[in-house]
């Protein structure tokens, strides 16, 4: 189907996943994504420059923590999704050892300095308030960064893993 990555950044995820369309407000990042072949609109997640029901799925990877108004951004994602379209959110769960590590160190991080981390439950609650059907949550990264020596497993659910993938479906 036709997908959109909101907060496409440099196109690091969109390009290998074959997502040709992205939204990114940061000029330098948008330029890098364009070099990877992504059609990037320099816009904000809270005001997407697309018509209603334009996409089969919307992807947001480590983007929700940078949004001024996550609920408004999710409303916009819902608006541009076709009926039964999927929203897929990859996020750092604030309520995990990994998330707490990031929260503590964010002032020293170039990338996460301005981040406002959320818990998976908060994001699921926002999705429910917008009448999305909860499809699935999966989690990984069960240790602090210092303790990880190999690829961490993926498990269903959320609440333990530091990185959570949430998939929810727009009602028909």
PLM region spans:
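Core SAM-dependent methyltransferase catalytic element
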Residues: 150-172
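Local beta-strand N-terminus motif with an aromatic residue
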Residues: 55-56
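Short alpha-helix
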Residues: 115-137
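A conserved beta-strand element that flanks and buttresses the S-adenosyl-L-methionine
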Residues: 59
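Class I SAM-dependent methyltransferase SAM/SAH-binding core
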Residues: 2-47
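Short catalytic micro-motifs in class I SAM-dependent methyltransferases
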Residues: 62-65
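Conserved class I S-adenosyl-L-methionine
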Residues: 86-115
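A short glycine-rich, Lys/Arg-flanked "PGG" loop and its adjoining helix->strand segment in the class I
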Residues: 71-83
């Amino acid at each position: 189907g036709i997908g959109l990555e909101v907060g496409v950044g440099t196109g690091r995820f969109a390009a290998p996943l074959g997502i040709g369309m992205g939204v990114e407000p940061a000029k330098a990042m948008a330029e890098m994504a364009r070099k990877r072949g992504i059609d990037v609109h320099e816009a904000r997640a809270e005001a997407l420059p697309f018509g209603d029901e334009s996409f089969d799925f919307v992807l947001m990877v480590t983007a929700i923590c940078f949004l001024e108004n996550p609920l408004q951004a999710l409303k916009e994602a819902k608006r541009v999704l076709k009926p039964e379209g999927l929203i897929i959110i990859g996020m750092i769960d604030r309520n995990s050892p990994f998330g707490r590590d990031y929260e503590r160190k964010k002032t020293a991080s170039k990338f996460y300095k301005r981040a406002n981390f959320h818990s998976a439950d908060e994001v699921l609650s926002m999705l429910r308030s917008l009448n999305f059907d909860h499809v699935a949550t999966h989690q990984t990264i069960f240790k602090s960064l210092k303790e990880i020596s190999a690829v961490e497993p993926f498990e269903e659910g959320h609440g333990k893993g530091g990185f959570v993938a949430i998939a929810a479906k727009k009602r028909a």
